């Protein structure tokens, strides 16, 4: 058991100040956890991606699941079970993107880079790098479609988001 540390207010002062302004203009108190548009998006954590803007939606419309590389992991599947059975999701868009670091090298490259930059041995972690984005997208979509705890009626599609043009390019999966 560790002793709780005080919140590092000085390091997060910009975040807390912005939240104060957000609270003053907040108008979403009537939203529920239900996805109004019945959509979940699995995408990357890359800060160039604004999932709601990309698909023309707003808060309350979509469930957004993010991780490095937009990979369909065990945790993504767990979350989709909740989203489909309890929160109104009937369709899933798996949306990796161009210029993704997870698609620019293999596991050993990532481990080596982290070790060089930080001196940390990360070989105990599997980063789920991607050697071919399109092939991996097809495989990840298939993983959702084949997961026995998800509804058979769930519609799943894949598209690659271009971070330089903003365009979604659909992929036959």
Regions of interest found by a model, annotated:
Residues 21-25, 30-57:
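N-terminal short beta-loop-beta anion/metal-coordinating cradle
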Residues 1-35, 69-75, 82-87, 101-173:
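Divalent-metal-activated hydrolytic enzyme cores
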Residues 19, 41, 65, 94, ...:
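Divalent metal-coordination and catalytic microenvironments
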Residues 87-97:
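Ordered, amphipathic secondary-structure segments that act as subunit-interaction surfaces
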Residues 45-48, 98-102:
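Gly/Ser/Thr-rich loops at beta-strand to alpha-helix junctions
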Residues 43, 66, 172:
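Pocket-edge structural micro-motifs
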Residues 42-44, 95, 159:
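Short hydrophobic segments within beta-strands
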Residues 56-64:
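Short helix-loop-beta junction
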